Design a protein with these regions (language model features):
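Bacterial Sec-dependent N-terminal signal peptides
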Residues: 1-27
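Start-of-domain marker
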Residues: 22-106, 116
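Extended intrinsically disordered, low-complexity coil regions enriched in Ser, Thr, Gly, Ala
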Residues: 51-65, 195-205, 260
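Helix N-cap / beta->alpha transition motif
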Residues: 71-73, 213, 251
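Amphipathic beta-strand/beta-sheet edge segments enriched in Tyr/Trp
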Residues: 91-149, 218-283
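A charged, solvent-exposed segment within the mature domains of Sec-exported extracytoplasmic proteins
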Residues: 117-182, 190
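Flexible, glycine-rich surface segments
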Residues: 158-242
Length: 283
């Protein structure tokens, strides 16, 4: 399904630019080129967002693979044509084939170069952060682990370029078997009604789990707890039908994806981690 990416800049604050993204698969040349770039993190124009201060701290703590710096959206519009740079930025993404106006906030790592449209810039990684209307406190506490994942992903595809496909994240489902030795942290509000209690979960999931708070997940990430994996759920929080609900299980220490899937939200499959997702984890 082809996503549409929108990005806002100072030059176009009163309008949005629609960008029809292709399902681009980075080549071996793209991957090699990335490691020669300086990575520029695009800061948000909205002074009310905490993203800017958080991402600065995260990059200082996590980013090791390239030199990095920070730029404004206006500078991004100028520098994105230069191949000596790569960029970390957030965008608004929708999926034309889904036939819904649902929009999501994605975090991208893309290469600069002579690309007229933003969607033509080669994506090294694109991760769903949140449904676009969700407050940033729903994802900000997970930014460190997601940036850590992006960095690790670049190293993985450098070492194993053969895994790079349109659905590259499906590769991480090979890690599902390792979940049985860890404790799965989940938020109650991110569980579907069929599995929203300890008793219901135990009927379908035999491994260790805990229904926790955001603070518990943030603490596990900060401590790099090797015994914890946690659910990163991206959905419209019950406000949309036919929208996508992404469910990703991430290691608090290694930032590895242990499970990656999404479903279309219906009455039968609501916005949340489903009974079928738990069953997928024990296959």
């Amino acid at each position: 399904m082809t996503p549409t990416k929108w990005i806002f800049s100072l030059a176009i604050m009163s309008m949005c630019t629609w960008l029809h993204a292709q399902s681009y698969v980075p080549s071996r040349q793209d991957i090699a080129a990335f490691f020669t770039t300086k990575t520029l993190v695009v800061l948000e124009d909205n002074p009310m967002m905490e993203y800017n201060s958080i991402i600065k701290k995260v990059m200082e703590q996590e980013w090791k693979v390239t030199e990095y710096g920070f730029i404004s959206n206006k500078e991004f519009e100028e520098k994105r044509f230069d191949p000596q740079y790569s960029f970390i930025y957030m965008s608004r993404v929708s999926f034309e084939a889904d036939k819904t106006d649902a929009a999501y906030r994605f975090l991208h790592l893309s290469l600069g170069g002579d690309y007229f449209r933003l969607n033509e810039m080669p994506d090294m990684a694109s991760i769903p952060l949140a449904y676009y209307e969700v407050d940033e406190d729903g994802y900000a506490y997970k930014l460190a682990i997601l940036v850590r994942f992006i960095q690790n992903h670049t190293l993985l595809i450098k070492e194993h370029p053969e895994i790079v496909t349109v659905n590259v994240f499906k590769h991480y489902n090979d890690n599902i078997a390792d979940i049985k030795g860890k404790t799965l942290y989940i938020l109650k509000e991110e569980l579907s009604p069929a599995v929203n209690s300890d008793a219901k979960i135990k009927k379908v999931y035999p491994y260790k789990f805990a229904i926790v708070t955001r603070d518990d997940i943030e603490e596990a990430i900060k401590e790099r707890n090797p015994d914890v994996v946690f659910l990163h759920k991206v959905g419209p929080q019950g406000t949309k039908m036919n929208a996508r609900c992404y469910n990703v299980v991430i290691g608090a220490a290694d930032a590895k994806f242990y499970y990656f899937d999404f479903h279309k939200i219906t009455d039968k499959n609501p916005d949340g981690f489903l009974e079928s997702d738990f069953k997928n984890l024990v296959k």
